[in-house]
């Protein structure tokens, strides 16, 4: 269990490591390409309210991992607690560290203001400042400007990244806990990995986060799920004859 969760955590961590390795820094949208719109659509699967739909779809996709409906319902409860706990951790860390997002830093630089002044405003005023500034930026499309207006909170850590990492950890954790090594289970984990990696890339590419925001989000999700699945395994809550432990 621990090894498998750690392996997929490491795979996600490759994204911020590669960003650092290639010294990529977001500084405006002058390098934005057409395919970035597809990254935006993907990143929206982790945005409120669409994230709720994503959760419902994923919970249904996980159904085949469980032996019966009762076991699946218990699993859905664990999924809900997992998503809720990681989002609470994310919110707490954002409040404590209060780090500005890349696109707000860029706004402050170009308007000769400060991020402190920006975040001193309430969210509605921040959205107006974002709209006013990015409306003058020809390289920022309307869909991205609207996304910025909706995401004027703090940067560290990434909520979308912890959301994506959480669902990957759930897929890996439940497949291990229930001993489901079927092709469908491996396909689910593979799809969740690709979705998660693209989610992480989108957050940096669209000017929403720094690599450290992604890294801490991933590690936080890993730590939470090591605790969750260790507890479930120890208490034998999901009893099954196919359980594996590695």
Regions inferred by a protein language model and the residue ranges of each:
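Alpha-helical transmembrane segments in multi-pass membrane proteins
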Residues: 77-86, 90, 217, 221, ...
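Interfacial loop-to-transmembrane-helix boundary motif in multi-pass membrane proteins
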Residues: 68-79
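Helix-boundary and loop/linker segments of multi-pass membrane transporters
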Residues: 26-33, 67-69, 141-142, 181-182
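Membrane-embedded catalytic cores of phosphoryl/pyrophosphoryl-handling enzymes
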Residues: 2-6, 126-246
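Aromatic-anchored segments of alpha-helical transmembrane domains
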Residues: 13-21, 83-88, 194-204
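Membrane-water interface at transmembrane helix exits
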Residues: 23, 59, 89-98, 102, ...
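Histidine-/acidic- and/or cysteine-rich, low-complexity loops and terminal segments associated
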Residues: 22-24, 104-147
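N-terminal transmembrane-helix/juxtamembrane module of multi-pass inner/ER membrane proteins
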Residues: 1-65, 74, 90-112
């Amino acid at each position: 269990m621990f090894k498998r969760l750690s392996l997929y955590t490491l795979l996600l961590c490759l994204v911020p490591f590669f960003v650092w390795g290639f010294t990529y820094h977001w500084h405006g949208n002058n390098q934005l390409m057409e395919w970035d719109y597809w990254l935006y659509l993907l990143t929206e699967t982790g945005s409120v309210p669409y994230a709720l739909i994503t959760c419902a779809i994923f919970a249904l996709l996980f159904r085949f991992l469980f032996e019966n409906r009762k076991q699946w319902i218990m699993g859905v409860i664990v999924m809900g607690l997992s998503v809720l706990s990681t989002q609470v951790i994310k919110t707490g860390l954002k409040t404590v560290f209060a780090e500005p997002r890349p696109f707000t830093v860029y706004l402050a630089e170009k308007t000769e203001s400060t991020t402190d002044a920006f975040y001193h405003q309430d969210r509605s005023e921040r959205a107006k400042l974002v709209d006013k500034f990015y409306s003058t930026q020809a390289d920022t499309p309307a869909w991205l400007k609207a996304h910025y207006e909706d995401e004027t909170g703090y940067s560290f850590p990434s909520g979308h990244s912890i959301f994506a990492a959480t669902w990957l950890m759930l897929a890996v954790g439940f497949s291990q806990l229930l001993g489901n090594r079927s092709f469908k289970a491996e396909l689910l984990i593979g799809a969740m990995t690709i979705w998660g990696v693209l989610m992480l890339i989108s957050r940096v590419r669209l000017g929403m986060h720094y690599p450290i925001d992604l890294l801490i989000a991933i590690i936080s999700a890993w730590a939470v799920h090591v605790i969750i699945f260790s507890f479930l395994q120890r208490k034998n809550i999901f009893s099954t004859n196919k359980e594996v432990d590695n």
